[in-house]
C-alpha cells in the first residue's frame, strides 16, 4: 500500500500514457476525483467514470491526437517528506501557461490559475503539461 495516493495516481496515468493505453484504473478517493475532474475540464483526459460499490475505482480515459500524447508530462511537487506551499501570488506557472498546476486550497482543489483569481494560496500538489 502506498502512502502518497496522489503520486500513485499520477504514476499510473504516466505509465498508461507511455504505453498508449485507452484507459487506466485508479482506486477512488475524494482528492483523486477532484484531480480527475480538473484534468477533464482542462482537456487532458477524455472522460472518467466511477465504478464499484465497496471498492470504488476511477476509470480514466486518456486522450491522444493521433500518435501524439495530450499529456506530455506529470510531476508531483508536494511530497509527504517535503510539503510545498505557495501564496496566491506565488503559485508557479507551468511552461509559461501551457501546463497547469494543481493546488489544494481552503476552498478546495483547483488549478493554479483559478487559485490566483480566487486569491487563495495552498499546497502545490502537481504540475501537468
Curated annotation (Swiss-Prot):
Keywords: Ribonucleoprotein, Ribosomal protein, RNA-binding, rRNA-binding. It comes from the Bacteria. Disulfide bonds: none annotated. GO terms for cellular component: ribonucleoprotein complex; ribosome. Pfam families: Ribosomal_S8. One of its GO terms (molecular function) is rRNA binding. PROSITE patterns: RIBOSOMAL_S8 (PS00053). The keyword Membrane does not apply. GO terms for biological process: translation. Belongs to the universal ribosomal protein uS8 family. One of the primary rRNA binding proteins, it binds directly to 16S rRNA central domain where it helps coordinate assembly of the platform of the 30S subunit. Part of the 30S ribosomal subunit. Contacts proteins S5 and S12. This is Small ribosomal subunit protein uS8. The lineage of its organism: Bacteria, Bacillati, Mycoplasmatota, Mollicutes, Mycoplasmataceae. The gene is rpsH.
